[in-house]
Amino acid sequence: MGSNDLINEAYDDSEVVGEERESKSAWMKRWYQLLTSPLDLQLVINEKLEMINWDAYAKSLAKPLGNFLTILFFIIRLLQDNLIKPNYYKLNVKSGAFDLSKSNKLKEFDYLWEISSSFQNSNQFYAFQSWYFVTLRFLNNLFRFTIFILLSLNLYVSCKFMFGYFKTYNLFHLKKEFNSPNLTKHNLKDLSKEYYEDIYKQSLWSMLKHFFRGSRDDGPHVNQNEVEIFFQLRKWIPTNFMINLFVSFSPTAIVFLSFSDVSFTSAIAIVFHQYILDYIITKRFQRSVDDDLILSSAALQEYEDKHIMVRINQCSNIDTLSSAMGTRSKTPRIFTTHSLCGEEIREVYNYEKREFEALPKMTESVPGSRETRIKDYGGISQVSDNQSHPIGFHYSPRMSPYYRDKVLDNNLAQSSSNENLEKGGAFLPNQDQNRPSKSLSPLRKTPLSARQKRFEGSEFNVLNKNDINSILRSPKKKKNYHKR
């Protein structure tokens, strides 16, 4: 049993040793990849940073971080002006400037050597030998390095905030040129060229190749008659995280602390400056931008709700084109709103004035439905004098009397023409004698013999008989023979 336990323990130790070797080999591979391909590590870090939603940490991270850096800069400048500056001479004096023990001339004379040694032993305080000044010298170097780091960080944040957040928009439908330094005119041919921003993102060889070779205009040809101008807007859009970091770690406070003698009373000015800047930019200007966004969204939603559309869609419009009644009347949409008192207000859009007008209460009538219109126009409608009219030549009682009288006159004229045709003895070959003619042409209303006599007595009698017969027997022919 003891030998088996020893074997199991040896086996377990071998597994632990194997895991340690694997971990060491994995670390070696990672260090090798880090040293051989640092750009891959940079790419991974950039991807991780871009995936973070920094605007969500604007209040919890950016503002406290900026305030901490400002307070740190204030404390360092306070220590420099009140601790390092009074001892500046003692900290910067050279330790070996008056060391008499290193003089070869004094060593030649014994009495001078004794005097110099006694003088140095009596002076027990030297700036370069004291622990206090050694500590101050170290703090002075540390403060200088920290000030340099904070100034560089503040310069980076300021430049990134003011020049690093721009987006370019190409406006092809803008006609009016506004007075803005960010709005510029460009030619449409510029779209076919490579942008310099894309060139800068390429490799060094591609950049050199482009600048030495020159740009080539390989884009499509633009018609000179067309408008070749478009506007380009370069809009400044900083992130919320960068706005809070810039306000809390502002360059104005850093410049003030750098070029002034800092004391404890300077803290009052710094606190007042931080509060005013945060109140103006964050609580006023940024909220004003958010309010403008709310108004734009509300206006867009109102336009979508009140958008004037046709009362029928395209499919139903196509279906009703072949019917006898034609398409339905397109009446403007009536918008119903309510006043502050609860009264119902109906408005209609006026295209000439480009504004909504309130409808009076007497005219607030919505057109009838499709079923009621079909009932009004269906079958044969009865009008005055007990006369009936077929579909397509009548109007419902809702129509105006003017159109009703017009229809009656047309029907009387049609009936009289039918009687004249029945009295005449000649009809065209392609015309049915049992039903009245549908055409209202004068050529169809008169008999063939009367038309021939009238034509022979006119100025066209110089034509031969065949031409006359062809003209009379083909009234639908568009080209007529005239005397030349």
UniProtKB/Swiss-Prot annotation:
Residue ranges with Polar residues bias: 430-440
A GO term from the CC aspect: nuclear membrane
Superkingdom to which the source organism belongs: Eukaryota
Example of a GO biological process term: maintenance of rDNA
Region (Disordered): 416-457
Pfam families for the chain: DUF2418
Keywords: Membrane, Nucleus, Phosphoprotein, Transmembrane, Transmembrane helix
Transmembrane segments annotated in the record for this chain: 145-165, 252-272
Amino-acid biosynthesis recorded as keyword: no
Phosphoserine sites (modified residues): S3, S417, S474
Membrane protein topology class: Multi-pass membrane protein
Main location: nucleus
InterPro entries assigned: Nur1/Mug154
Localization of this protein: Nucleus membrane
Subunit structure comment from the entry: Interacts with CSM1.
Function in brief: Member of a perinuclear network that controls recombination at multiple loci to maintain genome stability. Required for rDNA repeat stability.
Record family assignment: Belongs to the NUR1 family.
Name of this chain's protein: Nuclear rim protein 1
Annotated organism of origin: Saccharomyces cerevisiae (strain Lalvin EC1118 / Prise de mousse)
Originating gene: NUR1
